[in-house]
């Protein structure tokens, strides 16, 4: 998935990538119906609809011309969904730490191989930033793994919370980079928060059957 991200971001804009990547919850609902036999309720549909519209309003993508890399992003979102479905379906196979280590082992081995072939010299400051970013991303992956592994009866409604990352990105952009949103984007942020709120009764309804 990181490879797909790097390749696509070289060929499409960030707003287009973000919007297409947010199709993952839609894939999640379809797979939850087929493979997990979950009962999908109206709150889940409202959460998905509100979240996706919110993303469109925030990133405001152009999509002026079709780009073959759009399909690659959708494929990446599909792979993410497959991974989380496996975590949920086979939750008793190993611990969260086990899934985390097994999944990351191959990626890190391949990364070291490419680094040895083409080593990159960087300054200490850049190395420090990369290290901090690595800690944060691995922590995020671990927590996501735990969430999807333990969300036995409400996988689809948990996935709806993915849309909240757009709100956090916007807040960080305002605080650290002085990137302010327009009115439409703020409306989108409200819809994304609303999406997270809809996911709460969605989870309760799934638990109650």
Where are these regions (language model features)?
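Loop-to-transmembrane-helix transition segments
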Residues: 1-4, 68-76, 115, 120-140
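Membrane-interface helix-cap regions at the ends of transmembrane helices
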Residues: 3, 53-64, 107-128, 174-178, ...
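Hydrophobic/small/kink-forming positions within alpha-helical transmembrane segments
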Residues: 3, 25-30, 55, 78-82, ...
């Amino acid at each position: 998935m990181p490879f797909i991200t790097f390749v696509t971001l070289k060929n499409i804009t960030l707003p287009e990538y973000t919007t297409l990547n947010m199709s993952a919850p839609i894939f999640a609902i379809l797979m939850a119906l087929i493979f997990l036999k979950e009962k999908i309720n109206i709150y889940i549909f409202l959460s998905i609809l509100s979240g996706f519209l919110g993303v469109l309003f925030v990133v405001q993508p152009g999509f002026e011309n079709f780009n073959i890399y759009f399909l690659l992003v959708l494929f990446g979102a599909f792979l993410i969904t497959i991974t989380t479905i496996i975590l949920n379906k086979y939750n008793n196979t190993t611990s969260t730490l086990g899934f985390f280590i097994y999944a990351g082992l191959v990626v890190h081995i391949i990364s070291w191989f490419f680094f040895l072939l083409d080593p990159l010299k960087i300054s200490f400051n850049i190395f420090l930033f990369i290290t901090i970013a690595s800690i944060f991303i691995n922590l995020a992956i671990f927590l996501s793994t735990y969430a999807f592994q333990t969300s036995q009866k409400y996988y689809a409604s948990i996935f709806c919370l993915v849309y909240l990352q757009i709100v956090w990105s916007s807040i960080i952009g305002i605080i650290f980079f002085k990137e302010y949103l327009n009115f439409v984007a703020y409306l989108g942020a409200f819809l994304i928060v609303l999406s997270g709120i809809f996911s709460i009764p969605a989870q309760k309804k799934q638990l109650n059957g």
